[in-house]
């Protein structure tokens, strides 16, 4: 008899993230990979750099071919990997949290991948992917950043110290949509490559984005105000179809794992440095930063809204 998934595993994962001998010669295995963001964004460049490192280190064993941008739609990519239509994707965990609700614990994590590996959280994440979505979770890159809300007009704050988003047309996505709605915002769900046009036409006049990349997207042409503090943390997960993973020999698996772990460390350091540089640029160009008077309450709502969404989804399974 089908039973609802226990919340015990979710609680264990939340605690974790908040705090080969085979030598026979084989032909090179061809794998395919898709990615969700435009080619000019740093997160795509980082994913492609990791693939290049894997291909170099695993030469003769594995070659990952990268499919063109948008060859599979952004939010369809995780499902395509699960079904085996494509082998790998580098994508945020929130983009497929409907299938693995516990992914909210990754999006809201305040830990580095290295800490999560050490405390066993990465193993819990991988087990969930294997059991519920026919994937293996190999790690997450480009960590160390967070998200801000950027607005066209100066933000207003209510008497309770929280932002007043009445009349604000907020673009959202699966990462932070629940948070925005908990703050009373009217939201418009759209992918990142649709936002510039939406800003230009006045369809939206506010959006969240990571603490790095708004200048690459050129949204700062329209969004001249930032609401502080930063909330959540970035994760670009490297996930792979489980059957494709099991089809690799142990040596190839080890090379892929090793390169991902190295890139977790190097990309984190690089993104943090780049984020600081971009913030200086935004200040120099006149962007205004607005601290939320009730900053602690604001951050608590961000966490609570994500976990409420997670528990609601789990109860339906």
Predicted features and spans:
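Short intrinsically disordered, low-complexity coil segments enriched in acidic
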Residues: 1, 18-19, 142
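Bacterial N-terminal signal peptides that target proteins for export
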Residues: 1-11
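C-terminal segment of classical bacterial N-terminal signal peptides
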Residues: 17-25
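N-terminal secretory/targeting leader peptides
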Residues: 26-115, 135-317
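A gly/proline- and charged-residue-enriched helix-loop-helix capping module
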Residues: 112-132
